[in-house]
Amino acid sequence: MLTLARQQQRQNIRWLLCLSVLMLLALLLSLCAGEQWISPGDWFSPRGELFVWQIRLPRTLAVLLVGAALAISGAVMQALFENPLAEPGLLGVSNGAGVGLIAAVLLGQGQLPNWALGLCAIAGALIITLILLRFARRHLSTSRLLLAGVALGIICSALMTWAIYFSTSVDLRQLMYWMMGGFGGVDWRQSWLMLALIPMLLWICCQSRPMNMLALGEISARQLGLPLWFWRNVLVAATGWMVGVSVALAGAIGFIGLVIPHILRLCGLTDHRALLPGCALAGASALLLADIVARLALAAAELPIGVVTATLGAPVFIWLLLKAGR
């Protein structure tokens, strides 16, 4: 039994090392690739200082942090709701952030600065999170809380549809681009949003023990002495914060929170001591590679990154499911 545990631990370490190398390679490629290829030797030239340090680096850091946040949020929600299909958009938090952002765009007539839009998106996500916590205080079961989140998401989606229907053509273009996701407008002015993600990411990665208990189910977690009500509230709030900040940075991006944790579990990373940091590394790498494709696929335009993640990731996910079922 001890030998089996050691083998699993070594396998987890190997996976984390491989994912770390993949993330570093994706980071290097993201800084080099673009309309102009800039090799590392030219990064400190005048051209490199402009393109790499002022344009590509802040965008790359934002992609890394958002990818990690979405993947970890998916892992937390899948353990919390005992549902492999749970992901950040399922509880309505992503749509809540969207309602906040759309309200800011429409009421501000497209004139509000980016920091104000970011604050409105975070506020929308936190409002939905507070509503969910209100439900949680009534000691609803996990399945009922999940259904409440789905209902809130549907309501927020309807509100966004109504807002887009009555918006002007200029606002409509901005809103539609946001709904498809993208990092085109990210620069160092959004560094405060990036910094807002880091403490929460680090804190959740350290919560492997309660996460492992939650993954066993509500009854087992209570028998092991876990204060289920407390941890459910804390994790829902943490997820709401990370999703709200991510939406403020990049808009609505699906697939990452759903598939990355599931793929890592299929690969053998079931212990949250390895799964949580693995999700951060894999989510960051996957979203960064998708962002590179979005930038380079068309010569004169940029693809929405949400479309790229769904197009590239869904076939891989289906292949892994078929492989695991054999």
Swiss-Prot record:
Keyword annotations from UniProtKB, A to Z: Cell inner membrane, Cell membrane, Membrane, Transmembrane, Transmembrane helix, Transport
GO CC field: plasma membrane
InterPro entries listed in its UniProt record: ABC_BtuC-like, ABC_transptr_BtuC, ABC_transptr_permease_BtuC
UniProt keyword Transmembrane present: yes
Gene3D superfamilies to which the protein is assigned, alphabetical: ABC transporter involved in vitamin B12 uptake, BtuC (1.10.3470.10)
Pfam families named among the record's database cross-references: FecCD (PF01032)
Side of membrane Cytoplasmic, spans: 1-10, 82-92, 139-141, 207-228, 268-274, 325-326
Subcellular location(s) of the protein: Cell inner membrane
Record carries keyword Transmembrane helix: yes
GO MF annotation terms: vitamin transmembrane transporter activity
Family under the similarity heading: Belongs to the binding-protein-dependent transport system permease family. FecCD subfamily.
Function: Part of the ABC transporter complex BtuCDF involved in vitamin B12 import. Involved in the translocation of the substrate across the membrane.
Subunit field text: The complex is composed of two ATP-binding proteins (BtuD), two transmembrane proteins (BtuC) and a solute-binding protein (BtuF).
Name assigned to this protein: Vitamin B12 import system permease protein BtuC
Protein's gene: btuC
